[in-house]
């Protein structure tokens, strides 16, 4: 499939979905405290999404069994909520999608549980800053590679590992569309990977996944949960962003 350019009206519908995602992540962030189970967070995600007239995007997607992806500590992405309780010092990654009138929004954030270590805080801050830098690069005329280069420029001085096996993506009527959006510059890309110019109407889900140690990851036996190969922490932030003539517009931000 080629890159689908969205109209102003379509981007407005995606903003509706994005606002639901933002508000639900806000609700979850408030209650992500020691003692709560991941299943309880999943139930809140379902309730709060549906209460806003939207549907949860991830349940059943490629067979995913829950409403939201929740990954803790060395879990990078695609964690399946269960009976695990959050503990003081955990890093919990909340990755949520919502659908409104057939249009998707997708965002993620890393939430400190209780008091986290200075090293963990540095990882969280750098990952958030790398997403902010990526968003600033999303102007017409730049290329997709400029997004990843912006992430890499923030992360590499810290010595953290940028996950290479999973990348950002286009989004719209489908949760995953072209193009792929790596979180690193083109020197690390697969030979021949498309590197289109950014045009008004492109909507991308940009999501740096940053590890405290190695960039290498592996998938657990459940077929979903991705963890760091060295067992160290990982952080993840994501926004759905529209490229416009006036610059980037974050569709999963606050009202």
Short names for language-model regions:
Residues 1-255:
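Active-site neighborhoods and metal-handling regions in enzymes and metal-associated proteins
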